[in-house]
C-alpha cells in the first residue's frame, strides 16, 4: 500500500511572513508525530512594471516597480488524524496563500 502524503504549497509577497508560516506548519506537524520534508524554497517570481512619471512628455522619466512572489513547498509523510486536525485548526497570517493536496 502506498504511503499517504500531504503536500502543502505556500505563496506570499513577504518572505518573512512565509517563513514564519512554514515554521508554524512544521512545528505543528512534528508535534503531532508526523514526518515533515521541507520547507523547500521554490524559485521566486519577479514581476517588473515600468511606468511613465510624466503624463505627457519626458519619456526618459520613468519609475520601475517590482513584485516578488515567494513560494515554499512542504510534504508531510504518513500524517495521523491528529495531524490533519491540527493543520485545519492552524491560523496563519492573512498574506499567505495555502494550497493543500492529499495524495
Swiss-Prot record:
Q: Does the keyword Ribonucleoprotein apply?
A: yes
Q: Which UniProt keywords apply?
A: Ribonucleoprotein, Ribosomal protein
One GO cellular component term, please give it: ribonucleoprotein complex
* BP-aspect Gene Ontology terms: translation
Give the molecular function GO annotations. Answer: structural constituent of ribosome; tRNA binding
Q: Which InterPro entries match?
A: Ribosomal_uS10, Ribosomal_uS10_CS, Ribosomal_uS10_dom, Ribosomal_uS10_dom_sf
Q: Which Pfam families match?
A: Ribosomal_S10 (PF00338)
- Subunit structure, as described in the record: Part of the 30S ribosomal subunit.
The function of this protein is: Involved in the binding of tRNA to the ribosomes.
Q: Which family does it belong to?
A: Belongs to the universal ribosomal protein uS10 family.
Know the name of this protein? Small ribosomal subunit protein uS10
Q: Which source organism does the UniProt entry give?
A: Methylococcus capsulatus (strain ATCC 33009 / NCIMB 11132 / Bath)
Amino acid at each position: 500500500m502506498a504511503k499517504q502524503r500531504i503536500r502543502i504549497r505556500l505563496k506570499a509577497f513577504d518572505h518573512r511572513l512565509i517563513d514564519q508560516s512554514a515554521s508554524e506548519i512544521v512545528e505543528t506537524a512534528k508535534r503531532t508525530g508526523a514526518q515533515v520534508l521541507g520547507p523547500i524554497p521554490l524559485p521566486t517570481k519577479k514581476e517588473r512594471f515600468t511606468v511613465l512619471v510624466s503624463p505627457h512628455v519626458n519619456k526618459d522619466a520613468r519609475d520601475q516597480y517590482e513584485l516578488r512572489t515567494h513560494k515554499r513547498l512542504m510534504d508531510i509523510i504518513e500524517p495521523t488524524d491528529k495531524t490533519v486536525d491540527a493543520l485545519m485548526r492552524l491560523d496563519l497570517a492573512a498574506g499567505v496563500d495555502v494550497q493543500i493536496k492529499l495524495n
